[in-house]
Amino acid sequence: MLLALQSQWLAILLAFQLSPAPPGGVSNLELKPETTRAFNQYVQLTEARINGEVSAPEKFLYVNGYPPERRSQALAALQRGDLLMERLQTTDRSGQTIVAPGALIHHWLGAVFVPGVTLQQTLTLVEDYNHHQDIYKPEVVRSRLLSRQDNDFQIFYRLRKKKIITVTLNTNHDVHYFPVDSKHWYSRSYSTRIAEVADADTPKEHEKPAGHDGGFLWRINSYWKFEEKDGGVYIECESISLTRDIPTGLGWLIKPFVTSIPKDSLQMTMGSTRTALTAGRNGNSKLEIGK
């Protein structure tokens, strides 16, 4: 469910195919400390805004912060079955863009409304990490719950994207769920380890050192909100990810992909979540949500 990933991969894969590889190939890229610091600053400021939203039911959803007319239109569209997508950007305290040297920060919001399901059914599905490989395939090749303590989860995803070339990643994530009241929950997911897999599914399979790879995905955080209201559940997800930058001289060609394709990926994630919940509501899902 994280997974607004295929977009970033597609953009970077295209860049690799259209640019000369540096000595030793694209695997020479290194995640530098200053890049990590910039990403962490971006996350910290974003979480400060999210903390304010989840502190009270009337501010809970991101769309609740829209001006009144726009908010009414957005909620009506969600209730009609539309999928809301918006590109977000967090700036520093002086309003300046936060630049991650040698990297790109991708930040998108997706929202859906699923009628006829409860908050408990929704939580049951999204916490069933052993079945995420069924819900979010083909990008999620394998999913596994490693440990759970109350509302804290440690999970594993094996991710794969086939586009021009094939990229496989082994990833670990810490996920934390927070109850606000009986109708409002939210969660936060943090990648703790992302390793690119070379020669995947062969006897020569091995992981490249984390942070010393092709830069397809260095970090990804996901922020989910769940609100039971109006006869169903509103679901929002913000995805913040860090990838390598676009090679010099190709921005004119690659930038449109970087700015638009992440939207398509998160749209897939939200749509798959809604589809699985709807199937469970109608009794057509093997996951049997809420049972």
Show which residues each predicted segment covers:
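Eukaryotic helix-grip
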Residues: 25-290
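Long, low-complexity intrinsically disordered segments that are proline/alanine-rich
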Residues: 19-25
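Bacterial N-terminal signal peptides
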Residues: 2-19
